[in-house]
């Protein structure tokens, strides 16, 4: 009986120690390190699922203080809070097909930077992106395959300078990963040129998520 009690006490102590260690770790890691270490936990099946409880909801009810902005694709396989193992109030997420930057998206970025004082912006593209596949398959450049708003996505990507340059070096039909990276690079450059982002000296990072492995790499 005493052995069982001692074992139970040891388990409780270990859990409390781990929670305390994680709290200290969060405070010492940079914003980018919080994302990369979170992805490592996700990859290794050790997701901590932080800040996902009623206590966190109450702590954020009067405002938010996200440590990073993440611009990513609408693809259901690419959920930033999951792949980076973050929780409520941690990330300011902007999503659309192809992780593009429209005026509205830029306005959202400006809000996070100017009003929430967020100091890290991540553009997170991903493998097997349907928007990039549609662009690659648009061989004749007509864009009008669906005769609806989907065509606008393809046209926007096809006009990106980085995509045009990449296609000149290696035809897009044989350079799928290059097309994904060029699209990410284009969004990064648009953000870098934003006056508010410049003024607040925000760090901007290009990343790519692999839907086959769950791994995020920095470009």
List where the protein language model places each region.
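Portal/gating segments that form or line small-molecule/metal binding sites
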Residues: 81
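Conserved functional hotspot residues or short segments at active or partner-binding sites
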Residues: 123
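Short glycine-enriched loops at secondary-structure junctions
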Residues: 72-77, 97-100, 126-127
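Divalent-metal-activated hydrolytic enzyme cores
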Residues: 19-65, 88-89, 98-107, 111-116, ...
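Positively charged n-region of N-terminal signal peptides that target proteins for export
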Residues: 1-5
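C-terminal motif of bacterial Sec signal peptides marking the signal peptidase cleavage site
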Residues: 14-17
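Short helix-loop-beta junction
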Residues: 85-93
